[in-house]
From Swiss-Prot:
Pathway: Cofactor biosynthesis; tocopherol biosynthesis
Catalytic function, reaction form: phytol + CTP = phytyl phosphate + CDP + H(+)
Subcellular location: Plastid, Chloroplast membrane
GO cellular component assignments: chloroplast; chloroplast membrane
Family: Belongs to the polyprenol kinase family.
UniProt keyword Lipid metabolism, yes or no: no
Descriptive protein name: Probable phytol kinase 1, chloroplastic
EC number: 2.7.1.182
Keyword list, A-Z: Chloroplast, Kinase, Membrane, Plastid, Transferase, Transit peptide, Transmembrane, Transmembrane helix
Organism: Glycine max (Soybean)
Length: 302
């Protein structure tokens, strides 16, 4: 047999392999994603898109490492610029400190969520993304423990200007960002919805509640009906918007007919949890995203 005929036989064998067997249950694929298949007769709310994402970036080797490192630096720079911009607006009395702090709360997490598709398709990309809030976590620890003093950071993310505040709500906030990136990443709607409810839902609830919150919730005098309603509405809308964003980029495929009511239910539960008089025991930056994750996991996997 000649060398040419040997190559032709090998080529023929490769292109006539038997097709892979059909996945019959939730199982990991070779590209480290999971197919969400539903029980017979039950329409799926979400399927991972097995097509090549429309946003194609490097996936392996030194090029992938450099690409993700560059993306990390870019996202870090964007987050730093955001905080500094609001600090400057506050310093010039263009924005009140309380409003500036809440806008940072809303925008920093959402911009981090929007940045995920910038990273490569490598399974290791999530670790590069998680490095961004990890750096902010270290900044909060250093300043919260008074090992250093960044007045701009303290004014931008604390209520009273006390560095110890950095070790509570803001620290919990960045820890949830890290958790969502590492555990859920782009393969699941759970992390997307959780961050949308924590950042947009809870953040807008505070802004609206302080301005129009004269009518309080009967079981919690510190929370208002206007704030809770705004959290429900904006949390739902931002969650749907983010899911649509990831759907357009090809990371997930959604059955919108079943996804919309499920996200509405998740938003309702998250709003209910946020309205409970438990803030002194559990911070909203912990209770809201963790409750959202639990309900979303149950909703999208059943």
């Amino acid at each position: 047999m000649t060398l040419l005929s040997s190559h032709l036989l090998v080529f023929s064998a490769v292109h006539h392999r038997a097709p892979p067997t059909t996945t019959t249950r939730n199982s990991p694929t070779t590209n480290h994603t999971v197919r969400f298949l539903c029980s017979p007769g039950v329409p799926p709310a979400v399927r991972l898109d097995q097509r090549l994402p429309r946003f194609v970036v490097p996936g392996a080797g030194a090029e992938d490492l450099l690409y993700n490192a560059g993306a990390t630096v870019g996202v870090l720079g964007g987050g730093y610029a955001l905080v500094r911009a609001f600090d400057e607006l506050t310093r010039r009395n263009i924005l009140q400190q309380g409003l500036s702090r809440k806008l940072v709360h809303i925008l920093s997490g959402l911009l981090f969520l929007v940045s995920w598709p910038i990273f490569s398709n490598s399974p290791k990309a999530r670790y590069f993304a998680a490095f961004v809030p990890l750096v902010n976590c270290l900044r909060l620890l250093v300043n919260g423990l008074s090992l250093a003093s960044d007045e701009g950071l303290i004014k931008s993310v604390t209520r009273e200007g006390d560095p110890l505040e950095l070790l509570r709500g803001p620290l919990y906030y960045v820890l949830i960002l890290i958790l969502s990136a590492l555990v859920f990443w782009r393969e699941s709607p759970i992390g997307v919805i959780s961050l949308a409810m924590m950042c947009a839902g809870d953040g807008i609830a505070d802004i609206i509640g302080r301005r129009y919150g004269s009518m309080k919730i009967p079981y919690n005098e510190h929370k208002s009906l206007a704030g809770s309603m705004s959290m429900l509405v904006f949390g739902f809308l931002v969650s749907i918007g983010m899911l649509y964003y990831y759907s357009v980029l090809g990371h997930v495929q959604l059955d919108w007919a079943s996804t919309l009511p499920r996200v509405a239910f998740i938003s309702f539960v998250a709003t209910l949890v946020e309205s409970l008089p438990i803030t002194k025991v559990v911070d909203d930056n912990i209770s809201v995203p963790l409750a959202t994750m639990a309900v979303a996991f149950f909703t999208f996997h059943h």
